[in-house]
């Protein structure tokens, strides 16, 4: 029997994807969107987290769905590097450096392709065209670490609730990730992973604590309140998870939770509509 899909979660994913596209297209509200849109995906992943089947099965599944696509995509971009140079998709012209977010690209050899693929396998670096895959890398690292910690805690606590120790661990990692961001340290993307672990954890907490039966008018009030909070936060600081940058750990948590409330209430209000089903 096919697994029953949650229309609200599907709607939240859809809203998140739309926000991501808008945020990367010069949309006037980009700074507002960046406050929470990537945190939303980590939290959704935490919401859907399950160790059913055991940690080995979980790790194998994540290797196929996250690690392998990361390696294959970056390897493909490297193999096609010289073709992209000829087509002017990439360039060796140093004037490109005047445009933020770009880099000078040089031709590669077969040796370069092999060597760089080895680096992709351990998340060491990336390609210019594959820059957006930082999320895939971070989600893989966070998911695997969370699963291992969960498995160890279940063994140590003999089946007792792991929510509190996981929360303490995520708090420590959030502080470490924030300090890494301030220091500019992000080897193998571990600084970003440390910061985002708490977002994954929040998703697991929200799944256990969220009330489903809420009157429609209350959902509208919650969404409006969350929107107002995000407007205020947007004047106080910013979030850029791709570079492990955020004003403070508390700021990241507040913006992420407000964004979750806004998107979830919007999804709950729109999921029953015929055009969304």
Regions found by a protein language model. Give the residues of each.
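Loop-centered beta-sheet repeat module
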Residues: 166-210
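Hydrophobic alpha-helical segments of polytopic membrane proteins
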Residues: 156-168, 203-229
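Hydrophobic alpha-helical membrane-embedded or membrane-associated segments
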Residues: 65-69, 73, 142, 170, ...
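Alpha-helical transmembrane segments and terminal signal-anchor/GPI-anchor hydrophobic tails
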Residues: 213-277
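Transmembrane alpha-helical segments
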Residues: 45-53, 141-152, 198-211, 255-270
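Membrane-cytosol interface segments of multi-pass membrane proteins
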Residues: 1-174, 184-185
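Hydrophobic alpha-helical transmembrane segments
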Residues: 7-18, 132-136, 191-202, 262-271
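Interfacial loop-to-helix transition and helix-capping segments at the boundaries
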Residues: 27-38, 123-138, 180-199, 234-261
């Amino acid at each position: 029997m096919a697994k029953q899909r949650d229309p609200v979660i599907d709607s939240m994913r859809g809203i998140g994807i739309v926000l991501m596209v808008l945020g990367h297209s010069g949309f006037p509200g980009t700074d507002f969107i960046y406050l929470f849109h990537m945190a939303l995906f980590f939290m959704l992943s935490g919401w859907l987290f399950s160790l059913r089947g055991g940690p080995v099965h979980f790790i194998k599944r994540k290797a196929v769905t996250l690690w392998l696509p990361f390696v294959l995509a970056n390897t493909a971009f490297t193999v096609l590097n010289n073709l992209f140079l000829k087509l002017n998709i990439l360039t060796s012209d140093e004037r490109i450096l005047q445009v933020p977010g770009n880099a000078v690209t040089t031709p590669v050899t077969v040796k370069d392709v092999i060597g760089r693929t080895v680096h992709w396998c351990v998340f060491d670096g990336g390609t210019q065209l594959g820059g957006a895959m930082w999320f895939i890398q971070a989600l893989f690292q966070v998911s695997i670490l969370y699963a291992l910690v969960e498995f160890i805690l279940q063994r140590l606590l003999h089946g007792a609730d792991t929510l509190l120790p996981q929360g303490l661990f995520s708090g420590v990692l959030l502080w470490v990730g924030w300090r890494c961001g301030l220091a500019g340290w992000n080897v193998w993307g571990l600084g970003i992973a440390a910061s985002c672990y708490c977002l994954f954890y929040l998703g697991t907490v929200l799944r256990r604590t969220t009330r489903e039966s809420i009157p429609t008018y209350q959902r509208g009030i919650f969404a409006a309140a969350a929107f107002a909070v995000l407007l205020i936060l947007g004047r106080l600081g910013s979030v850029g998870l791709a570079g492990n940058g955020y004003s403070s750990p508390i700021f990241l948590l507040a913006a992420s939770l407000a964004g979750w409330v806004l998107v979830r209430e919007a999804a709950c209000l729109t999921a029953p509509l015929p055009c969304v089903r």
